[in-house]
Amino acid sequence: MSVESQPVEKISELPAGSTTVVHAEKAQKLIQKLGLKRVEGITRVAMRRPKNILLIINEPIVYKSSNNAYIVLGKVTVEDMAAQARAFNESQKQATETKEEAAITEESGDAQPADTAKIEESFEQEKAVDETGVDAKDIELVMAQANVSRAKAVTALKENNSDVVNAIMSLTM
């Protein structure tokens, strides 16, 4: 007599109120016939995949075979850790930008004439930087990677003999 021809009985191990299909119940009967033992006390299973993707099963039904292999049943949810990290970094970046903007507006309201003179001097210094001997593409790259002004990028490139990597490292470290 095959499993399919047997009347399907509700298995007591299924959570009450779950909407399982007949095939899942039959699969659980077959699992029990294979001699697998149910493992109690597991509330969450996480499986790591390449590229920081996690497969998460909450409230799983877990069986253990005689050769220490585990069979996990339950609803799988996919979590992309890389996307979550990018979203977290963006939110942190926005938070720091708003804090910086608030600090700038606070400072600009209380700015004294001496402060404005210093700001004007720094703008004049940035305009007066000599870019001879430095490639424009290298300057743009250093500006983008180190998030600095053009004058600082040119200065760093000149100090590091037009070595882009060392210029970026000197500006960011």
UniProtKB/Swiss-Prot annotation:
Localization annotation: Cytoplasm; Nucleus
InterPro entries assigned to the protein according to its UniProt record, in alphabetical order: EGD2/NACA0like, NAC-like_UBA, NAC_A/B_dom_sf, Nas_poly-pep-assoc_cplx_dom
Pfam families referenced in this protein's UniProt entry, alphabetically: NAC (PF01849), UBA_HYPK (PF19026)
Annotated GO biological process: 'de novo' cotranslational protein folding; protein targeting to membrane; protein transport
UBA domain sequence ranges: 134-171
Predominant place of localization: cytoplasm
Region spans: Disordered: 89-117
Alphabetical UniProt keywords: Cytoplasm, Nucleus, Phosphoprotein, Protein transport, Transport
Residue numbers carrying Phosphoserine: S122
PANTHER family named among the record's database cross-references: NASCENT POLYPEPTIDE ASSOCIATED COMPLEX ALPHA SUBUNIT-RELATED
Subunit structure: Part of the nascent polypeptide-associated complex (NAC), consisting of ucp15 and btf3. NAC associates with ribosomes via btf3.
Identification of the protein by name: Nascent polypeptide-associated complex subunit alpha
